[in-house]
């Protein structure tokens, strides 16, 4: 066997095993970075020797050529729907009808009712062959290439005890984390948002371009076996047992599946799942109850479009209609101006809802919503009330347009919206009371001016007692004034005032970071300081010049230009300089002195001779980028005392590791 063929085979088996542990057992056996390293190696080998690539290779999930349309597939046997019950009385009626026919010696296999898209997946000789949507139950759309991209679905079944042909039926879902990330990306681009994870999953599965599906992080859980050939193949005699067989073949099955032996146990299960609903990582709208004994299922049979032996026990409605009575505009800690709808209180999803976010002006325009409209409210993810649609034929003649404010409702500063962003923001910055507490907490934080003892609670009290309105006021505080704070005696107050005085002497990079300019983190602040060297040069720069700085793109450049164009922000800066905040002049550094330019370094553990922030600043002065985590792109890890997981990861990746003594030698 060719060396590449052997390694490709071994890597394919190894990665598929890790996928099984990750998606089926919910028990990852290797770090993500190690999985990525193995996958990268497999891609390299398959590129070199494509003739040796396996059909079940995880690289086959990236998506292929776009389709012109979806073909229709006739199901091997109909995919039926379920009847519903909505309360305990209706469930008891369902249970009575079952026991009247098969007696009381039965149990129920209970599982969450996933709110996704039902699909059929066919395996022939253990190899993934095709997949289709439920459609009308008789025929569905061929979504084989899209389903192939879902990482949790095995391309080859595990073991060798599966039938020659097996049909797996289950639900494709979009986890909450993936849904939120998808909508955040859409919101940032000003694109239409998905209303809920179910719509997102359905829309993702019906993409003609499977590469788009591959990017959507879909999940899958099997809920039943479909057709098995030959029919004589020995299967478990219970529904739960058959799900366990699916699990043993590497097919994901929900960990929430449980067998209940009585009506009381079923109700306990229902109530437990409903209580934990918001903590699950996927949307559910009830629980599915199936008679567990296969013999009973066969005896009970089917009605026209549903089995008699199963039902969906639905949760209370998550969508209701109500009246939009008005809109308030709230200002968040980053200045985001968010419209919040005031609603006629309505009970939905188990709680009374009286407010719902409208997100931004684009969302208001998309919905076409006005004050006075009857709207449909949904508890998205069981947590955040969301307006999903208006009821157009109920709009009154006196409905009023929702007008986005041009001035901040808190500080009267201009509300601005940067091109390419969906969110409007107050330009007041540190001047805006809504942003002030968080801004001053950031200003005093360890990575900014590092005022020892100036914690969040101290900042909140200083502002609540009107002792501080802007960062410059911190440097005017007296010990006697500080004793007005709770649990602050004269000794502690004197110590804190001394720490504030020490913080006056800082660095240009720390000062810039402390200002809290959007998207300007430590590394960007350091790059700005190194490039402009003086405050006057920075203040006089244009957006075009900001883009010339390392790691500064068009969006960050726009944030900088907007911040420095606001008189309020310039006044805050001038006041800080006036009270004595200063830093050493930055000298020109010759290119040959940037010995670490282009390198990425990480610090971990306790440094006993160097201050961590000083070490970081000195590394940056030599051109290095100092990161917070180890990756394959890390050039060197400095391991101090009691170094932990970062050191282990660096050793696994083969990253160069040095101690503090070696770092001192490099910096000296």
From Swiss-Prot:
According to its UniProt record, the EC number is 6.5.1.2
Q: Is Lipid metabolism given among the entry's keywords?
A: no
Superkingdom is: Bacteria
Asked if the record carries the keyword Ligase, the reply is yes
All residue ranges annotated as the BRCT domain in the record: 591-668
Query: Catalytic residues?
Result: 113
Q: Enumerate the InterPro entries for this protein.
A: BRCT_dom, BRCT_dom_sf, DisA/LigA_HHH, DNA_ligase, DNA_ligase_AS, DNA_ligase_CS, DNAligase_adenylation, DNAligase_N
Matching PROSITE patterns: BRCT, DNA_LIGASE_N1, DNA_LIGASE_N2
Q: What does this protein do?
A: DNA ligase that catalyzes the formation of phosphodiester linkages between 5'-phosphoryl and 3'-hydroxyl groups in double-stranded DNA using NAD as a coenzyme and as the energy source for the reaction. It is essential for DNA replication and repair of damaged DNA.
Q: Which PANTHER family match?
A: CHROMOSOME TRANSMISSION FIDELITY FACTOR 18, DNA LIGASE
**NCBIfam families, per this entry?**
dnlj, PRK07956.1
Full protein name: DNA ligase
């Amino acid at each position: 066997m060719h060396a590449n063929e052997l390694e490709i085979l071994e890597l394919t088996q190894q990665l598929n095993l890790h996928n099984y542990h990750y998606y089926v057992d919910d028990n990852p056996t290797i770090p993500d970075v190690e999985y990525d390293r193995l996958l990268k190696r497999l891609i390299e080998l398959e590129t070199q020797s494509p003739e040796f690539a396996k059909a079940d290779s995880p690289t086959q999930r990236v998506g292929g050529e776009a389709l012109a349309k979806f073909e229709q597939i006739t199901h091997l046997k109909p995919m039926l729907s379920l009847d519903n019950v909505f309360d305990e009385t209706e469930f008891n009626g369902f249970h009575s009808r079952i026991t009247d026919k098969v007696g009381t010696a039965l149990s129920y296999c209970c599982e969450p009712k996933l709110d996704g898209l039902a699909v059929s997946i066919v395996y022939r000789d253990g190899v993934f062959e095709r997949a289709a949507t439920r459609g009308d139950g008789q025929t569905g759309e061929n979504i084989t290439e899209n389903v192939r991209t879902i990482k949790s679905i095995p391309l080859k079944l595990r073991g060798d005890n599966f039938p020659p042909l097996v049909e797996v039926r289950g639900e494709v879902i979009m986890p909450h984390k993936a849904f939120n990330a998808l909508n955040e990306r859409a919101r940032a681009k000003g694109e239409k948002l998905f209303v809920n994870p179910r719509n997102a999953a359905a829309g993702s599965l019906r993409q003609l371009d499977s590469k788009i599906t591959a990017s959507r992080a879909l999940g899958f859980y099997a809920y039943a076996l479909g057709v098995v050939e030959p029919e004589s193949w020995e299967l478990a005699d219970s529904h739960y047992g058959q799900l366990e067989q699916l699990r043993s073949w590497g097919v994901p099955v929900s960990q929430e599946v449980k067998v209940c032996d009585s009506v009381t146990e079923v109700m306990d299960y229902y109530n437990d799942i409903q209580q934990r609903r918001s903590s699950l990582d996927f949307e559910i709208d009830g629980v599915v109850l199936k008679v567990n004994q296969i013999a009973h299922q066969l005896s009970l049979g089917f009605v026209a479009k549903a089995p008699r032996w199963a039902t969906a026990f639905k949760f209370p409605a998550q969508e209701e209609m109500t009246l939009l009575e008005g809109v308030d505009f709230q200002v968040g800690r980053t200045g985001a101006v968010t419209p919040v709808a005031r609603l006629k209180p309505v009970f939905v999803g188990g709680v009374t809802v009286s407010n719902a976010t409208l997100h931004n002006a684009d969302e208001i325009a998309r919905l076409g919503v006005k004050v006075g409209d009857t709207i449909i409210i949904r508890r998205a993810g069981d947590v955040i009330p969301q307006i999903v649609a208006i009821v157009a034929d109920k709009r009154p003649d006196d409905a009023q347009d929702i007008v986005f404010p041009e001035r901040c409702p808190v500080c009267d500063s201009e509300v601005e919206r940067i091109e390419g962003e969906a969110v409007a923001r107050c330009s007041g910055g540190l001047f805006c009371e809504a942003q002030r507490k968080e801004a001053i907490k950031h200003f005093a934080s360890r990575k900014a001016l590092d005022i020892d003892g100036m914690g969040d609670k101290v900042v909140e009290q200083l502002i609540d007692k009107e002792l501080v309105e802007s960062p410059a006021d911190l440097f005017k505080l007296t010990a006697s004034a500080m004793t007005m704070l709770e649990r602050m005696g004269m000794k502690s107050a004197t110590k804190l005032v001394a720490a504030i005085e020490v913080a006056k002497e800082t660095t240009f990079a720390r000062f810039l970071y402390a200002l809290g300019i959007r998207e300007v983190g430590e590394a960007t602040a350091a790059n700005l300081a190194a490039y402009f060297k003086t405050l006057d040069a920075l203040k006089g720069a244009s957006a075009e010049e900001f883009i010339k700085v390392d790691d500064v793109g068009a969006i960050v450049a726009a944030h900088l230009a907007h911040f420095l164009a606001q008189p309020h922000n310039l006044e805050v800066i001038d006041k800080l300089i006036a009270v004595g905040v200063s830093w050493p002049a930055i000298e020109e550094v010759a290119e040959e002195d940037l010995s670490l330019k282009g390198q990425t370094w990480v610090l971990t553990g306790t440094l006993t001779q160097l201050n961590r922030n000083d070490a970081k600043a000195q590394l940056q002065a030599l051109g290095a980028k100092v990161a917070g985590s180890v990756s394959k792109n890390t050039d060197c890890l400095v391991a101090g005392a009691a170094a932990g997981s970062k050191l282990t990861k660096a050793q696994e990746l083969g990253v160069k590791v040095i101690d503090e003594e070696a770092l001192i030698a490099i910096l000296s």
